[in-house]
Amino acid sequence: LTLEGLGADAVGVNCSLGPIELIPVVEEICRWTTLPVAVKPNAGLPDPNTNLYNVTPDEFAEAAAKFSHLGVKILGGCCGTSPEYIKALTEKLSTEHFVPRTVNIPSAVCSYANTSVIDQPRIIGERINPTGKKRFKEALKNNDINYILGQAIEQAGAGADILDVNVGLPDIDEKAMMVKTVKALQGVTDLPLQIDSTIPEVIEAALRVYNGKAIVNSVNGEEKSLETILPIVKKYGAAVVGLALDENGIPKKAEQRFEIAKKIMNRAMSMGIP
């Protein structure tokens, strides 16, 4: 999710294990990307005494060729392999039938270790926000990062699926605090984050240090908002919350709000934001 959003041309795995051991890893990768998948296994694992790898060229080719059945388009070898291994793999692949992948990826966001699929209502914890919270404002002014982390841990324990992060306060350097907070949060929780700010530079700084696919909160129908927020969303492969309001405020009629929502969707899609 993260790499495809960032514009990678292909994703995959190399080294670490032999071809048989990498099959479940590759199966999972294929579930979550529409990009070409690359696989370069080791020739098994090295013997600790001889440093020789335990999979022969023919065994390697027989096992690695199974990846073509998963729709893998790029195959090679890593540690322990040699031209002899690649020759055996090429010969084996010439007799195999490549199976094209059909992937239907749901809307989802992720951290470095946790994916939240947006296929039903999700709980977003909103406690990391100074609005109406005197103690939180004090924590921001005093650079009390531990208090902020405590709020994250409590919300995770209470069942939040995603954590909103807002550190906007007139008396502080919001950009610096946002970067510090996002980095620190990733050390105590694996929940995906929602970056919440009205300042484009703050949003981009947060996405720059975030290890995953975040949500941006938010964009609206104002031309200025569309022109400044959506390019950042596109650049970092984020998801984004769209607010049905514009230069004239919040429309009273549902039909007018729908038109704003459609405007946001059309602009996002024209930029290649899914």
State where each predicted segment sits.
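Domain-level signal for soluble alpha/beta catalytic cores
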Residues: 1-274
